[in-house]
């Protein structure tokens, strides 16, 4: 079964893209305002990954609490959970009965995932510009400033001041499209919601 091409990339990008306070602002201004103001977000997502050989769609839910906490759960067609507790990133693959743990700094510190725990990382890591509108969605084009970022671009779409869509193309030509729903930009989250304990009987690997 094919898994998402780059889970940490996906997590990182989605941490940028939430409902914003001012629907009147341009898409770039809205994105910057979120990174200045927003501390938490929760919701659901549908993700479609297109490669040269196949297309896969997955569904799930997510929670983010700044600084540095996130939980991403794929619920169908497979079950997989990714948790960042501020120090460690845990990836639990239910089908494989396997947990992989990585230092959070090593796993996402040099990638877009740094946005999850650093409100200033967006402007330091990306070049942002307005990228037009389609079907009522206003887009921001985020281009990584470093050539080794692993992807070519990210497009982030807002509709009526709320996150609506995201698209990214990686360095291998794979394209990921994500739609968001049920967004809550003021969720009641505690740090305990981002604690992960490996289930009994699973293999635990370290990166």
From Swiss-Prot:
One GO biological-process annotation of the entry reads:
lipoprotein transport
**Which key words are in the record?**
Chaperone, Periplasm, Protein transport, Signal, Transport
Domain of life (superkingdom):
Bacteria
Coiled coil ranges: none
> What span is annotated as the signal peptide, if there is one?
1-23
Please tell me whether the keyword Transcription is annotated for this protein: no
Task: Give the UniProt subcellular location, in the record's own words.
Answer: Periplasm
Family matches, as Pfam families: LolA (PF03548)
* Cellular component aspect of the GO annotation: periplasmic space
Predominantly, its location class is periplasm
Its assembly, as annotated, is:
Monomer.
Q: Which family does it belong to?
A: Belongs to the LolA family.
- Purpose of the protein: Participates in the translocation of lipoproteins from the inner membrane to the outer membrane. Only forms a complex with a lipoprotein if the residue after the N-terminal Cys is not an aspartate (The Asp acts as a targeting signal to indicate that the lipoprotein should stay in the inner membrane).
| Protein name, UniProt field | Outer-membrane lipoprotein carrier protein
Species the sequence originates in: Neisseria meningitidis serogroup A / serotype 4A (strain DSM 15465 / Z2491)
């Amino acid at each position: 079964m094919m898994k998402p091409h780059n889970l940490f990339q996906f997590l990182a990008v989605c941490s940028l893209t939430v409902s914003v306070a001012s629907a009147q602002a341009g898409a770039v201004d809205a994105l910057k305002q979120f990174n200045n103001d927003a501390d938490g977000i929760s919701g659901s997502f549908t993700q479609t990954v297109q490669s040269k050989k196949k297309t896969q769609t997955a569904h799930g839910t997510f929670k983010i609490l700044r600084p540095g906490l996130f939980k991403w759960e794929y619920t169908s067609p497979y079950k997989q959970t990714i948790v960042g507790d501020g120090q460690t990133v845990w990836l639990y693959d239910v089908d494989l009965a396997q947990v992989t743990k990585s230092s959070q700094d090593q796993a996402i510190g040099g990638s877009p995932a740094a946005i999850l725990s650093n409100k200033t990382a967006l402007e330091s890591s990306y070049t942002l510009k307005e990228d037009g509108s389609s079907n009522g969605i206003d887009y921001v084009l985020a281009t990584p400033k470093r050539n080794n970022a692993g992807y070519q671009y990210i497009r982030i779409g807002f509709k009526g001041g709320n996150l609506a869509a995201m698209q990214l193309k990686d360095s291998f030509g794979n394209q990921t499209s994500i739609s968001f729903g049920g967004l809550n930009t003021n969720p009641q989250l505690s740090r305990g919601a981002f604690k992960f304990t490996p289930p009994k009987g699973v293999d635990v690997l370290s990166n």
